[in-house]
Amino acid sequence: MVATLWPVNDRSTALLVAEFYQLLFTERQDPAAALASARGHLRDATVRELADWFERRYDDSAGTDLGAFEAAADFRSHRDPNERPYAHPVYWAGFVYSGP
């Protein structure tokens, strides 16, 4: 089970969970390793990478995921495409895995 130790940001959670499930089911990582990798991915992701991710999600939804469209636009509006907006531990450190 993946849980959080404190309330977390919706957008960063969506990114972390998507990466976690990609690693868990597609790449067949064990859950603890997948969560650790997903946390690192979120921590290190740049504004440019995040905007690209949300744009792909919007495109994959055939234009129906307006939340992804808005998120991509928000990230594109940042001045520094190399900024890491989720680098602070508050966004990723609260996620924990418990289980076999």
Predicted ranges, named:
Residues 1-11:
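Short acidic/histidine-rich active-site segments
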Residues 13-100:
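An often Trp-containing, charged/polar helix-loop segment at the C-terminal end
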